[in-house]
Amino acid sequence: MSDIWHVLSVILVVLIPMALMVLGAARWAGYLRGPASLSPSHRRMLEKYALPYQRTASKDRPRFEHIVAQFIADKEWQGAGIGVAEEMKVLVAATAAQLLFGFDDVRLDHFERIILHPDSYRSGRKGTLHQGEVRPTAGVIMVSWGDLLRGYGNPRDGHNVGLHELAHALWFEHKLSEDKAPFLHPELLQRWIDHADGEIERIRNGRSRLFREYAGTNQAEFFAVAVEYFFERPGEFNAELPELYTVLCGMLNQFPDKASLS
């Protein structure tokens, strides 16, 4: 019996320190891989500049902050003829948080770079004037900082280039993830496409009850414009196109017409 206890004691002496080392390493690795935390200065910027955050209920602000911090940490930030200040990162990330708030773990991972231009810029072979662009193959989202600010300067006009370009990114992110981890419910997405086809036709015929003409370009542009109206004019969207609005609520898991600051 004494021999058995001796063997057990040796095993425990060896295994316990090893287990503690493994657990400690795992905790440290988990810490390194854990979510980014929002700095106090970034939180102050959110409170001062970010209208979506200001409109978020107090109980939901920690989640909003988490998405902002993670988005800032995940992306490579570049300026095209402009220095990228921390306030710029915070406002773009707050726009992303507004769009992504209803998803459990969608970070737009295919888009690694955010490029900010000082204002509208010319791009492409024809030198077309742009307020923003999304390039899925390059993993790039580009936004005109001046136009982004103007969009937030009039938050009820249904025009916000930040929401527009990030909606494009979300649309492409789903398509790029469709074979592995799609996050837009397939039945809701099909209902969206069916309703959108009819509304696009009405836009092209000048009979739209809500959306601006540009939404009739194609399905991708229709979705991006609809997202702008969804967050900036939700009551009107719901009143004019209730079926389409309800489907988008389900797709994004958000109900902005019922949002509260409580």
Task: Show where each model-derived region lies.
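N-terminal topogenic membrane-targeting module
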Residues: A25-G81
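Generic beta-strand structural signal
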Residues: E112-I114, G139-I141, H159
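Peri-catalytic and regulatory segments of divalent metal-dependent proteins
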Residues: D60-I72, E76, A80-L100, D104-H110, ...
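N-terminal signal-anchor transmembrane alpha helix of single-pass membrane proteins
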Residues: M1-P35
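Metalloprotease/metallohydrolase-associated module, dominated by Zn2+-dependent proteases
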Residues: I72, K89-D104, D119-V143, D147-G153, ...
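Active-site recognition of the HExxH zinc-binding catalytic motif
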Residues: A57, D157-H174, A224
